[in-house]
């Protein structure tokens, strides 16, 4: 039986979605919440969507943000192998998760809404849950088949998944970018995308039967870090009312705008170093970077070491005034209920990824991830526990 179309009118125009085959769940996919961050809008805060006339087709997922696609596909295939699924189910999931073949684009600032059918006609507004995907701030998408589930909508929630800019497109800091910013800062474009998505939810979710005063943000891994970042960011205040952080990093994986932290370069220094490699000598680097295609930039980005791509959220004193750890210690975070926890033995998801590269991968883990994020006794303890590549099996 063919699925039936449904429509909704949001702040930027009319959109068309679909009911699922059961007729009980409505889906709107690829709904733009900000203008495409392309051309002159690359490395700028998200801009408002240009309204459209007619009805926009929102029955299909939009593109993923530019990312390290092949590595993410390998990760999810490893995850599927560990789920203990039957052969048929496993093959179908692996076929669905061909991330490398998924369309990627800078025009990625879209979200998806899933809700009980006719929720907009109910006498009460439904709770809203906004999912922020993980992926080390460099991979992932709200469009992943892994998140394409009716579970929350079947339980009476309006479920929203979002995209945000990743890697160098989402977190590149550079003095020339700071110079053109009214705030004098740069680097948190992906975080600003998340805030823009929450503003869209505030302004539009009632159309879908959701309660804009009952919004829960939740995410896992880098998505859990994003939850803590949003609790720290003043511009996100009032946009959500509960938070769930699943397995966020506690390693201090935030760059400071103009000073080093542990072994990380300052965010602007890292941005200048990247620009030097891509376009050469300093001076006028920003205009030359914006003239390059996304494919050209991605090629340069993918040549960086897997664990050494230092484009993370930036403690800039404005968008992110301090690290979440410091904000929580000083009781300066958003005053909303928070549920936080970690998945047991989560790192075993990555164990199989270590075998093909052996000692080389182990070396990169130490030099590119553990050592920059650790200091003093913690670093020495790691060196004692994993002194050589022959001890990779201890990570399993």
Regions inferred by a protein language model and the residue ranges of each:
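Substrate-gating cap/lid region and adjacent catalytic-acid/histidine neighborhood
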Residues: 242, 254-257, 288-396
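Active-site loop->helix "elbow" adjoining a glycine-rich segment at hydrolase catalytic centers
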Residues: 134, 189-193, 221-224
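Alpha/beta-hydrolase active-site loop
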Residues: 108, 183-206, 263-269
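A conserved short beta-strand
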Residues: 237-250
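Short glycine-enriched nucleophile-adjacent loop
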Residues: 224-236
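A short, hydrophobic beta-strand element of the alpha/beta-hydrolase
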Residues: 217, 244-246, 341
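Non-catalytic accessory segments of hydrolases
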Residues: 2-188, 212
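Alpha/beta-hydrolase fold nucleophile elbow
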Residues: 208-220
């Amino acid at each position: 039986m063919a699925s039936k179309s449904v429509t909704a009118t949001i702040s930027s125009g009319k959109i068309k979605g679909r009911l699922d085959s059961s007729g009980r769940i409505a889906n709107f996919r690829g709904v733009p919440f900000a203008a495409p961050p392309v051309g002159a809008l690359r490395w700028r805060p998200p801009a408002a969507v240009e309204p459209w006339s007619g009805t926009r087709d929102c029955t299909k997922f939009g593109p993923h943000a530019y990312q390290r696609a092949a590595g993410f596909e390998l990760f999810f295939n490893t995850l599927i192998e560990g789920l203990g699924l039957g052969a048929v189910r496993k093959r179908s999931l692996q076929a669905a998760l061909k991330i490398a073949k998924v369309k990627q684009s800078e025009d990625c600032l879209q979200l998806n809404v899933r809700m009980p059918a006719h929720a907009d006609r109910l006498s009460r507004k439904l709770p809203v849950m906004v999912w922020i995907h993980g992926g080390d701030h460099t991979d992932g998408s709200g469009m992943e088949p892994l998140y394409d589930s009716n579970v929350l909508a079947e339980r009476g929630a309006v479920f929203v998944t979002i995209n945000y800019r990743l890697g160098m497109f989402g977190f590149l800091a550079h003095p020339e970018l700071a110079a053109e910013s009214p705030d004098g800062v740069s680097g948190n474009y992906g975080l600003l995308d998340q805030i823009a998505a929450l503003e869209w939810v505030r302004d539009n979710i009632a159309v879908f039967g959701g309660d804009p005063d009952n919004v829960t943000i939740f995410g896992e891994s880098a998505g859990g870090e994003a939850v803590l970042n949003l609790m720290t960011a003043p511009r996100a205040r009032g946009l959500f009312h509960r938070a769930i952080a699943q397995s966020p990093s506690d390693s201090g994986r935030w760059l400071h705008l103009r000073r080093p932290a542990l072994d990380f370069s300052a965010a602007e220094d890292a941005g200048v170093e990247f620009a030097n490699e891509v376009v050469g000598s300093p001076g006028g680097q920003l205009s030359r970077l914006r003239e390059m295609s996304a494919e050209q930039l991605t090629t340069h980005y993918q040549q960086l070491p897997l664990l050494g791509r230092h484009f993370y959220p930036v403690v800039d004193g404005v968008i992110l005034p301090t690290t979440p750890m410091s904000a929580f210690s000083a009781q300066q975070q958003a005053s909303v209920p928070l549920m936080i926890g970690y998945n047991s033995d989560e790192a075993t998801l990555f164990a199989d990824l270590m075998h093909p590269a052996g000692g080389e991968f182990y070396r990169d883990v130490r030099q590119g991830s553990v050592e920059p994020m650790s200091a003093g006794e913690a670093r020495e303890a790691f060196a004692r526990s994993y002194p050589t590549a022959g001890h990779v099996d201890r990570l399993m």
